């Protein structure tokens, strides 16, 4: 009996290790809980790129559209630029939100990598990012015709990711 009691801590350690490794192998670090999926897009008034009065409340946006948070300082954002340009050429409406960025830097970024956006809004303080629940950039939201967020992607879009977002809009 005492031999089994002596082995109990070792068995518990092995069991915990198996659970931890199992979780780590199944967990995709790019998939984050998306609290807003299934809910209306947040009501956030953002200033257009280049200045002006905040005039475009994102919560009034009706889809199907993609809302893409990006930054000129973000290397992964540059990686996804070709996928966004391909979506634009297919007629997909994309609204860009320049996250924690300055207008001149955003304009240079768009000249360098292309401008796939129908509208470009700015979030220099990151407040809209908080309201949308982003954890970094790039992040892309698919919004259906009723203004409801139907999908979210928290990494650079690939052509396959873009297709998946478009399929979620078609449902």
Label each PLM-derived region with a short phrase.
Residues 78-114, 124-130:
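Structural microenvironment flanking redox-active thiols in thiol-disulfide oxidoreductases
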Residues 7, 111-116, 123-170:
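Thiol/disulfide oxidoreductase modules built on the thioredoxin-like
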Residues 66-67, 94, 140:
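Hydrophobic beta-strand anchors of alpha/beta hydrolase catalytic cores
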Residues 72-79, 139:
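C-type cytochrome heme c attachment motif
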Residues 1-47, 171:
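N-terminal targeting signals for export/organelle localization
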Residues 49-51, 145:
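Short, ordered coil/turn segments that flank beta-strands lining enzyme active or ligand-binding pockets
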Residues 56-75:
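Short active-site neighborhood of thiol/selenol oxidoreductases, capturing the structured segment around
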Residues 54-57, 150:
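Generic structural signal for well-ordered beta-strand positions
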């Amino acid at each position: 009996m005492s031999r089994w009691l002596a082995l109990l801590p070792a068995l518990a350690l092995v069991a915990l290790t198996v659970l931890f490794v199992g979780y780590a192998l199944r967990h995709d670090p790019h998939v984050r809980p998306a609290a807003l999926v299934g809910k209306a897009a947040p009501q956030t008034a953002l200033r257009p790129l280049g200045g002006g009065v905040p005039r475009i409340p994102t919560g009034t946006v009706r889809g199907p559209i993609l809302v893409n948070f990006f930054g000129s300082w973000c290397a992964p954002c540059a990686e996804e630029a070709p996928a966004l340009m391909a979506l634009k050429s297919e007629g997909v409406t994309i609204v860009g939100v320049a996250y924690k960025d300055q207008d001149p830097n955003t304009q240079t970024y768009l000249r360098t990598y292309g401008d796939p956006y129908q509208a470009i809004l700015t979030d220099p303080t990151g407040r809209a990012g908080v309201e949308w629940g982003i954890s970094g950039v790039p992040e892309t939201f698919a919004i259906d015709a009723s203004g409801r967020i139907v999908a979210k992607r928290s990494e650079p879009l690939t052509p396959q990711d873009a297709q998946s977002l478009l399929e979620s809009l078609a449902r």
